[in-house]
Amino acid sequence: MFNEVHSSHGHTLLLITKPSLQATALLQHLKQSLAITGKLHNIQRSLEDISAGCIVLMDMMEADKKLIHYWQDNLSRKNNNIKTLLLNTPDDYPYREIENWPHINGVFYATEDQEHVVSGLQGILRGECYFSQKLASYLITHSGNYRYNSTESALLTHREKEILNKLRIGASNNEIARSLFISENTVKTHLYNLFKKIAVKNRTQAVSWANDNLRR
């Protein structure tokens, strides 16, 4: 049973796709690269038991509308800190469709190779998300579902938004630390994490992004 499979990360990998030699090879590569355990499940078969902390890789290349609706409904009933990731996603898959996926934490497009998938999953295991900058902006500003469904990997935390708003008024790290009653090192850690989440390289870009995407 899949719920008996555990990993050192506290996570397990569930690849939902059409069984094939290629899918089996991909799963094996991911398991070896990430030192994580997991299982392949036939996308056309129902599945009720998804273990806590599971990372669900949904192969969009094998999903028609009926299957998408089934799996969205299935995953929406799970509240045990699972993370949903879309694999082989068409480049033109609408953002409004992506936000309908419960617990969505990342989107891998069909044009991305296996090493990008491995790199993205490494970030997921660290509690990050894997979105393009445009998609991240959309989810933050438009998607109430995303904010509700995401748990430990919320795209921007309340504290990160506080710090971004401090940056908008020109506050230094020291001033931010004093105003929020935290250390400068903690501020730097938050800045590092949020820069990665919104795909910017410096404070100026972060302020520009915040002005476009956050309310004061």
UniProtKB/Swiss-Prot annotation:
It holds the Pfam family VpsT-like_REC. One of its GO terms (molecular function) is DNA binding. GO terms for biological process: regulation of DNA-templated transcription. Keywords: DNA-binding, Transcription, Transcription regulation. Residues 173-192 bind DNA. Residues 149-214 form the HTH luxR-type domain. It comes from the Bacteria. The master regulator for adhesive curli fimbriae expression; necessary for transcription of the csgAB operon. Plays a positive role in biofilm formation. This is Probable csgAB operon transcriptional regulatory protein. The gene is csgD.
